[in-house]
């Protein structure tokens, strides 16, 4: 019985201690904070947003310029749910290292991909 109570308490704590949700209003700041400490992998687990590959970006609609000029960035963000995104313009522009698979992304809502990979020389997926 004590073990069940302890497990229930741990579950409640872990559910209440979640990471800050990623939205249009904070995604640029979240990227800046994360990549200031982990510029290549985005594995900033200790940040309030958690590690970048694990972010829930399902409510984000604008990812335009998100990784613009991030020359070293090459995080695996293939699991992101980008189905709500409408703007991905210049998202990886002038990013010379990014080369991760994005083939499973649902980009059916995207209306602007202008220069999304402009001068992103390493991208070959």
Predicted feature locations:
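Negatively charged
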Residues: 17-125
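Sec-dependent N-terminal signal peptides
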Residues: 4-14
């Amino acid at each position: 019985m004590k073990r069940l109570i302890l497990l229930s308490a741990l579950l409640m704590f872990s559910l209440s201690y979640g990471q800050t949700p990623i939205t249009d209003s904070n995604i640029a700041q979240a990227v800046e904070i994360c990549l200031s400490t982990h510029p290549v992998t985005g594995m900033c687990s200790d940040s309030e947003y958690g590690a970048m590959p694990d972010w829930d970006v399902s409510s984000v609609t604008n990812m335009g310029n998100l990784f613009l000029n991030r020359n070293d960035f090459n995080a695996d963000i293939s699991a992101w749910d980008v189905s709500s995104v409408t703007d991905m313009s210049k998202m990886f522009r002038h990013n010379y290292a990014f080369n991760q698979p994005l083939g499973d992304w649902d980009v059916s809502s995207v209306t602007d991909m202008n220069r999304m990979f402009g001068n992103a020389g390493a991208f070959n997926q």
